[in-house]
Amino acid sequence: MKHESSLNRIVIALGGNALGNTPKEQEEKVNVAAESLVNLIAQGNEIILAHGNGPQVGMINLAFDLASKQNNKVAEFDLPECTAMSQGYIGYHLQKGIKKELKRQEMPWHVATIVTQILVDKDDPAFKNPQKPIGGYYDEATAREFMERDPHIVFGEDAGRGWRRMVPSPRPVDIVEKDSIINMLDNAFIVIAWGGGGIPVIQDEKGDYQGIPAVIDKDLAAAKLAEIVEADYLFILTAVDRVSINWGMPNQQDLA
């Protein structure tokens, strides 16, 4: 079904690595990207921004884990809360950069971030095989030290680049906040949603949503988002030069 807007509706997925490794670097990259994003609006499009958070959420989670072990006044935060934090601060930088560019171009559009929950199947086989890398890169000795400190944490080697924390990556089923996203799109908002693939949730026996420690693949999430909002286009932006299969392996093949 086609959405009712006369404008082209575009979902843009920004890779977490494309946003930099520190808040300062991230803000600088967002400010550079903001002009191109706002230009899409000026050309007769409406946009929804999704973004990765692999480096960011991993660093947030690890920081709280280490701090809580050093100081009992620091609470531990599980992955759903850390994902929400990353959605907040990445969304803040995106909002600020885009709002500044909207003002410069004298455009009356609004911009807002929605903390987004994503429904997943509690029986998804991914929960038995955590393979989604998040956070920074470590040598093997450091990674094994982290696992010795906390047996619930799993680290694995990531395509020859180092060791990273591995978490389950279930497939997205639905967006809890989809009505809010569509309503804002229909009212001249640039919407920032589904940050980091969204906060994975399952429904309990009462029908309430419960967060779970997992990360949804950002590209799968963006595709589901594009489907739900009936987007005309889906753009996936990343820090790598081209699309490849068997990436980082001897039989790597570049597709584009």
Predicted regions and their residues:
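Short acidic, glycine/serine/threonine-rich loops at helix termini
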Residues: T22-K24, G58-A63, D123-N129, Q203-E205, ...
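N-terminal glycine-/serine-/threonine-rich phosphate-binding loop
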Residues: M1-A50, M59-K69, D78, N183-D186
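Conserved mixed alpha/beta catalytic, RNA-binding, or beta-rich assembly cores of soluble enzyme
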Residues: A18-G20, I175, I190-N246
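Alpha-helix C-terminal capping segments
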Residues: N39-Q43, H93-K103, K224-D232
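A glycine- and small-aliphatic-rich helix-loop capping segment at beta-alpha/alpha-beta transitions
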Residues: Q26-N31, A63-V74, K128-G136, K206-P213
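Solvent-exposed alpha-helices and their adjacent loops that cap or buttress functional pockets
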Residues: K2-S6, V11, R104-M107, V173, ...
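Short beta-strand segments at enzyme active-site cores
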Residues: V11-A13, E46-M59, H110-V115, V191-W194, ...
